[in-house]
């Protein structure tokens, strides 16, 4: 998931781990360099920005508490190439499934006006649904808004508060 830090010239990455029961297991936030037409302007104005996407995912996966006696589990993600290497490194004995969202979109377009559209299975629905809920509940994540994150740590803290509320923790 991506967001911004004060301006589109300073994008952020948000690594999210979600269980099949929609429980948020962990979150990490990192910086990204600007992409496309904004990259030159971003370089001039703010200097080079590190791509912390892979580090955020690795830190998130390492922070997950997995019992040594736990049975095997399946790690599901989208098809970003760096995920395979990181998952294999952190969880060498676990199976990693990658899913291409583009295939699912094409199926939906083809079956738009038929009854079959409702039967299309999205294997990473839990993750996509939690990301949509995050964007809806945390206004600093909405795409076209003045409510932007000014500091990376504040965004991470806000997402942790959402995680606690989502998972049913009692806040004191």
Regions inferred by a protein language model and the residue ranges of each:
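Residue-level recognition of single "structural anchor" positions
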Residues: 1-172
């Amino acid at each position: 998931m991506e967001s911004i830090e004060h301006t589109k010239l300073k994008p952020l990455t948000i690594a999210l781990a979600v269980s099949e029961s929609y429980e948020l297991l962990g979150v990490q936030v990192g910086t990204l360099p600007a992409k496309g037409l904004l990259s030159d302007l971003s370089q001039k104005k703010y200097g080079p920005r590190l791509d912390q996407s892979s580090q955020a995912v690795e830190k998130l996966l390492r922070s997950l508490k997995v019992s040594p006696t736990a049975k095997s589990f399946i790690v599901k993600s989208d098809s970003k190439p760096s995920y395979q290497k990181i998952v294999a490194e952190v969880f060498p004995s676990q199976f990693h499934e990658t899913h291409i969202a583009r295939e699912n979109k094409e199926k939906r377009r083809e079956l738009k006006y038929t009854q079959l559209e409702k039967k299309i299975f999205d294997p990473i629905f839990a993750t996509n649904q939690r990301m949509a809920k995050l964007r809806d509940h945390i206004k600093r994540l909405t795409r076209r808004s003045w409510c932007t994150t000014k500091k990376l740590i504040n965004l991470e803290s806000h997402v942790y508060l959402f995680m606690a509320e989502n998972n049913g923790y009692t806040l004191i």
